[in-house]
Each structure stands twice: as C-alpha cells, then as structure tokens.
Amino acid sequence: MKLTIATALASILLIGSANVANCCDCGCPTTTTTCAPRTTQPPCTTTTTTTTTTCAPPTQQSTTQPPCTTSKPTTPKQTTTQLPCTTPTTTKATTTKPTTTKATTTKATTTKPTTTKQTTTQLPCTTPTTTKQTTTQLPCTTPTTTKPTTTKPTTTKPTTTKPTTTKPTTTKPTTTKPTTTKPTTTKPTTTKPTTTKPTTTKPTTTKPTTTKPTTTKPTTTKPTTTKPTTTKPTTTKPTTTKPTTTKPTTTKPTTPKPCGCKSCGPGGEPCNGCAKRDALCQDLNGVLRNLERKIRQCVCGEPQWLL
C-alpha cells in the first residue's frame, strides 16, 4: 500500500511536466481517481489521498495542436462501435513486484475542453482502442495514473473497460428543521399623563340685594250674588206596546216506517234476518271496546300497559 501511494504521488508530480504527452489536446479534465472494486484482487482504498489531475496549458510557441496519434489502431475483435478518444494507458513493465501491473480501469468522465492561447486549429482525437466484446460507446476518457516510461519497449495492453457499476443513490433523510416561533414582542403601552388644567375660580361678585318696601294693598270683598235655580219640567214619553203575533204550529202527520217488525222496546220480537238481541248486544259491546282501545292508543297516544 505504501508503495502504491508513493507511486501515485510521483505520478502526480510527473503529470505536470509531461502534460503534452498525456493527450492534453483533448481538453484538460479535472478528474478524481477512485478505484472500482475488482473480482480477483482486493479493492483499492484511497482513504488518505484524493488526487486531482490538472493539465498545464501548452506553451505559447505551439501554433497547432497535433491530433491524438499516440498508438496505432489494432485489429478490433468483435467490436461494433468505435470509441472516441480513449487513449490507451501505458503500463510500466514490472521488474520486481507483480502488484504494480494492474490494469487501470477507466471510468467514463466528461471532460471540458480548455481554451488555450494562440491555438488556430484543434483536431479531434481519432485513436480508437480495441475492446473485447463491448457494445457501449464511452466518451473521451483520460488515464488516471500515468507512470514514467523507461527506455524499454512498452507493451501496450488492451484496456479492458468494465461496465460502470452504478452505485445506489443514497437518499439522505430529510431533516425537518423545527419551526422557530419568534416571540411576539408586546410593546409597552405608554400612558400619557393626563394634564389637568387648573380650574380658575372666578370670584363671585355678590350684588347687594335691594329690599323693596312691601306695599300692602287693601283687600276688597266682593258681594256674593246667588243665582236662582231653574227646574226643568220632566216630559214623560208614552210607552208603545207591540202586539205579540203567535205563529200557528203545523203538526206533521206521522207515517209508520215499512219495517215489518213490531214496535221497538223491551219484549219486541226481532225482524227476519236479524240475530237475537243477546248476541247482538255482545257483538256491539265488543265493537265498542275495540273502538275505545283504538281511540285511547292511536288518537290519545296512551301506552299499551295503561289500556
């Protein structure tokens, strides 16, 4: 681990000097190196250093930037799409430890082109790399860690672009801020002092009362005149008595009803088709009791237990 950290720091320092050879004409990206987990080798844990590669601008003497022709295109093996601007990473031939020959996995990073001074034409990067059975088209990617090349012939290994594992988006819990209720500042009511004006008491001027002498007039007694009482004669009106007219009473002749029965009353015989008197009385009494019960319950509204 210490060796890999030391090589990473040394590569960062060498990137600043070898920015022209590292395909800066495609645009100087600012990428952060994060190692993806591998299947066979243990994952890289870059907890101490987070390196950001910054490309230095090219010198003012260069008028045109050369296109990215760093490696010759090899024969593609079962490739369907042509990847734009993916510069192959040159891995250093390992001499002592086999741990340094790890294939660098390039993640898709969007790079913004930087505008440089005195540049007339900028040619696009046309260096396709060979990928084995890949159908995804990746944008222009820059290598994360570049090691200084030695005098030995460099063996260019094809970069195996692994599918980018999308990390699950961790939704942060929404922290609801407590609503701070501002205390209502009650302004003190300023009671103005009531200015009582001094009542100016005017001096009462007491006028001297002039007492007039009372003159006593002599009382003159008038003689009382008695009027004679006149008695009116009472006139008696003659009472007129009206003659009483007696109306003659007309007596209607009584016609006997055609019944066929004898006269009503006790001891009479019933007519033909009528029931006996005893049974008729019982039926009529029962009908009267039912009518009384219906009147008391339905009309008067008495409950059933009072009936």
Swiss-Prot record:
GO terms for cellular component: extracellular region. GO terms for biological process: puparial adhesion. GO terms for molecular function: bioadhesive activity. It is found in: Secreted. Its main location: secreted. Residues 56-257 are annotated as: Disordered. Residues 1-23 form the signal peptide. It comes from the Eukaryota. Keywords: Glycoprotein, Repeat, Secreted, Signal. Specifically expressed in the salivary gland. O-glycosylated by Pgnat9 in salivary glands. This is Salivary glue protein Sgs-3. It comes from Drosophila melanogaster.
